[in-house]
């Protein structure tokens, strides 16, 4: 009985020693996020992703702006070249529309007026197209930048309005002729009116572009 008691006391002593030597688990304090920012790896990755998305959006907006400015810079040349081509075709159709007797364009003041305005539109559009082509090739614009946009805006509008007035004069008489007879003379005048209208559309679009540039022009 004494031996059993001694062994039990020895076992209890050994268990107490082992418990004393075992290091206690240190409870780590919970740290609150600083200024509400996430301290996890996922939070850092999300922040980097958000920064990357923002940078890509800025680059896309800059590229889109460059493309828009490049299109606005090249459009006057294309529009004036198109206006010159349509005006030239209208001019040729009217000038060559001579078939004798009453089928002579010069017997009608409406067609003479259309011929004169088509000639003016051709000369103006050619001059503007040549100026813009020279500028885009790196040459010096003969018109100062401060006055160039105003010149484009006013010139395009004036010539476009003149073309519209010529069309308004030529359309009624052509309709009356075609209601009575349809021949080469009336077909040629109708085709000339169509070409003059396309020239008007090109100059009207050019006036819109030049007006937009003029509204964005800075004077400081």
UniProtKB/Swiss-Prot annotation:
PANTHER family assigned: CASP-LIKE PROTEIN 4A4 (PTHR33573), CASP-LIKE PROTEIN 4B2 (PTHR33573:SF54)
Keyword terms: Cell membrane, Glycoprotein, Membrane, Transmembrane, Transmembrane helix
Sequence similarity: Belongs to the Casparian strip membrane proteins (CASP) family.
Record carries keyword Transmembrane helix: yes
GO cellular component: plasma membrane
Endpoints of the signal sequence: none
Intervals, Extracellular compartment: 96-109, 174-188
Subunit structure and binding partners: Homodimer and heterodimers.
TM region(s), chain numbering: 75-95, 110-127, 153-173, 189-209
Organism: Sorghum bicolor (Sorghum)
Subcellular location: Cell membrane
Protein name in the entry: CASP-like protein 4B1
Glycan attachment positions: 184
UniProt topological domain (Cytoplasmic) ranges: 1-74, 128-152, 210-220
Keyword presence, Nucleus: no
Lipid bilayer topology: Multi-pass membrane protein
A Pfam family assignment: CASP_dom
Top-level taxon in the UniProt lineage: Eukaryota
Region (Disordered): 13-56
